[in-house]
Regions:
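Bacterial Sec-dependent N-terminal signal peptides
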Residues: 1-23
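Outer-membrane beta-barrel "beta-signal"
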Residues: 292-306
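Outer-membrane beta-barrel translocator domains and adjoining extracellular loop/strand segments
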Residues: 54-59, 98-102, 138-144, 185-192, ...
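Repeated loop/turn-to-beta-strand initiation elements of outer-membrane beta-barrel proteins
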Residues: 82-84, 122-125, 170-173, 223-226, ...
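Sec-dependent signal peptide cleavage junction
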Residues: 16-44
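Extracellular loop and loop/strand-boundary signature of outer-membrane beta-barrel proteins
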Residues: 55-61, 96-101, 144-149, 197-202, ...
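Residues on the lipid-exposed face of transmembrane beta-strands in outer-membrane beta-barrel proteins
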Residues: 43, 47-49, 69-77, 111-117, ...
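Transmembrane beta-strands of outer-membrane beta-barrel pores
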Residues: 47-53, 79-81, 90-96, 131-137, ...
């Protein structure tokens, strides 16, 4: 009887052990599946070309060829109490007319990372980092001997802490009362001249202020998607009423699986960047001071989404 009792205990322990092992395995698999589902990644590539060839054209004109490419990568994590969004945008465009040297029409590097902990249903305690720069040298065309910008000249690094409001899946509003904005000018000639608001002979300019950023991303009609990002920064120390503005807008119209039409605009106003212009056409730049900067690119090309 004693041996039978011990045998029953041994069998029952084995059954319980098997059940616990199965439960642990199911829990691990469920946790692993939930973790994988929490991460989302993707990319969008857009490439456009245009060409103009004229032969004995009585009305006149220039032969030209141009190309423009944009790559947009995103990686997001969404948990029960936290969210982490990362976005990298790379853009570059060139233009060649007749015998003139190649000129760039677009040059952009932008990385944005936002992490948030849930406070209420729609509000998150959040931190944001944004970095901007360019790939290659920029020149004061048509004079390609005067360099006016290059990689990390300028470069912008913005760090902010605040609250992020999320409305459904297409609209977010980030508000930060504590923001640090750093401007880098790592090219010696440009920094010595005080370009992009740095003190002459200095390579870094630091600012402290308030920051507001709104993001909108939605299919506004069938096969038409709109993405917009608006950033506003106010320097608490110097001229806080002069708001720095950076507004990006992208409208993407899908013709078929691979063909798209895009409209891309960028509006910038930075109170620390001096713009010179020839007001009376005598070849001398008379006007100096901050000015609105605007860029527009309309393209027809190939698009691929991962």
């Amino acid at each position: 009887m004693k041996n039978l009792f011990l045998l029953l205990i041994f069998c029952w322990s084995g059954i319980l052990s098997g059940q616990i092992t199965d439960a642990e395995t199911q829990l691990k698999n469920a946790t692993k599946t939930d973790t994988v589902k929490s991460w989302k990644k993707g990319a969008l590539f857009n490439l456009g070309f245009s060409q103009v060839t004229l032969t004995n054209w009585a009305a006149g004109g220039n032969n030209s060829i141009s190309g423009n490419g944009v790559a947009n990568f995103h990686l997001t994590y969404k948990g029960k109490k936290c969210a982490w969004e990362n976005n990298l945008v790379l853009g570059y465009g060139i233009l060649k007319q007749n015998q003139e040297s190649i000129q760039k029409t677009d040059d952009n590097i932008e990385l944005t990372s936002t992490y948030g902990r849930k406070a209420t249903e729609n509000w998150f305690y959040s931190g944001l980092i944004n970095f901007k720069s360019q790939f290659t040298d920029g020149f004061n065309y048509p004079n390609d001997s005067i360099q006016i910008s290059t990689f990390l000249a300028p470069g912008y690094l913005l760090g902010a802490a605040g609250m992020n409001y999320k409305f459904k899946e297409f609209l977010t509003l980030f508000v930060s009362p504590i923001t640090s904005k750093t401007t880098f000018v790592l090219d010696e000639k440009l920094s010595n001249s005080g370009a992009f608001g740095v003190t002459p002979d200095k390579i870094i300019r630091n600012e402290v202020g308030g920051y507001l950023r709104g993001n909108f991303k939605k299919e506004i009609m069938k096969n038409v998607k709109m993405t917009s990002s608006l950033g506003l920064f106010s320097n608490y120390i110097k001229n806080p009423e002069n708001i720095d503005i950076n507004w990006d807008l992208l409208i993407l119209t899908k013709v078929n699986k691979f063909i798209t039409v895009t409209i891309n605009t960028n509006l910038i106003y930075d109170d620390d960047i001096t713009i010179t212009s020839d007001k009376n056409g005598d070849g001398i730049n008379e006007v100096n001071g901050p000015r609105p900067q605007f860029k527009e690119i309309i393209g027809f090309g190939f698009s691929y989404k991962l």
